[in-house]
């Protein structure tokens, strides 16, 4: 006894048959069949795809027979296809552009044929299949429910684990759940897309086929985990994460971080040492995150104009490659402890002259951003971390040239053991004594270093003499050790640029000496009569003058520019402070002085003794003839009483007045060309 339905018939795949029980016998009936044809799915009779039963095809009998070449396009009435039993077609071609197709059902697609997606539309494959001719995604999107792997799932939606999936013409393989696949992936001409939302683990590897532009595009928020070697022309990570789990790296390849915070992660295998010359590009407007192998020599290029977060993941990961063409932002970060605390080893002299380097606060004295004794350029510098001249791959006094990106920036961390050169036209703001406290030196050759801490009492420019030269400028309020102002160098107390010079207030305190050679420039300013401005409502006090305070000596042979704001009304006897100098003032400076109101002129004679220049009565004639050699002078009191007459010269005037027994005070000296006010001390 038993049921016919319990009998399993083998070896007749692709043939229509039936079983019947007659006269005590089990009879196997085979149906006649036509030759295979090329036909199109119509779906006129519904969704069922079966063998020689349902008239849903454009074939001569409107049914499907084994070996038929099938095309699925936008002309079908029904696009939800139910595979009712095992079927063995020749090849399947999905040429839908507008309609969405879905293959489902209890039956499987068998045989040696291939499944080809050639339109621009979407195809879902939800059933389990066993065809072996490969899957070719030449456009559009193919979404399988399952993928086969050699660790538990023999067959999936796209056949067995060794059934190849080929991506070309920018076709998309989309996976909407986490899974593991052992299918080999081949990239054909114009490459393809893998779009996954969960974690897709590829054990079968990725290799290049024939053609050009065999690029792989990673889409979707999920992680694409590569457990075998991946070969491609270019990998574009547009979304999500690519995890190089197999530790084989991408030597010589180019990876483009082409999205928003997309991630490239290497297996952090600290027990094996590797070398990788992978090239990374971050286009303008894009951002990415890179977790490199913590024990690998990276020698590839970094290019682009976007933003990249690079994590230090261990202690033996030197970045030796040429990043000099990168014009974006590098956020240097520390990863989590992995046996040892990670450090960042920048280990080359190519530098990053066009990039902004942002050093994270987690880089400390013990776990630093290391420059390994290499001298190189940094386009702009920001962040709050610790930069060391040492490292695992070298040490020694190096030179960091900072500013060539020609942008304004501020760094709140610290530079240690390195000599520093400021270049570029931008402004580097320093707001703490700590930034350069342990640097070897600072030289400003272009642009501006702006001090931004009025209360500073220790040097903000390093523990040695600051050199300012070429087109460099020291500006702001704060403290510096000593200043050597060379040709082209500018010293400007106050926070404003030349265009707003008359608004400048505040003091630059020079602990030691100031030396300004010919061709250098010093700018000072006065905004009010008193040096301190008091707010009438709050009582708060702010500086009203911009000048220099020198703890040592000042030797000045450059040009001194004196300006004032219209909130100060100059009067006879007023003065402008240029220097408050504890030591001596010497030299032969040239003065460029803002014009005074009519009837007044500047008197620079007190400068070398007092660090000030004064406002005097003007005759309208330069120096009232005092620059013409010997002249006769009549001396009067302020009240107009004549005291004496004498022959003198400009150089000897003050001493000759004293020799006449005149007491300290203010007098009027008249010549044939006019008169001036002089003050004896």
Residue ranges with predicted function:
Residues 1-31, 58, 79-85, 382, ...:
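Extracellular, surface-exposed repeat/solenoid domains
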Residues 2, 33-34, 45-47, 61, ...:
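Acidic glycine-/aspartate-rich tracts in secreted/extracellular proteins
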Residues 27-61, 93-159, 187-251, 274-276, ...:
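Extracellular repeat-rich scaffold modules on cell surfaces
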Residues 619-624, 635, 640, 667-669, ...:
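Terminal processing/anchoring signals of secreted or surface-associated proteins
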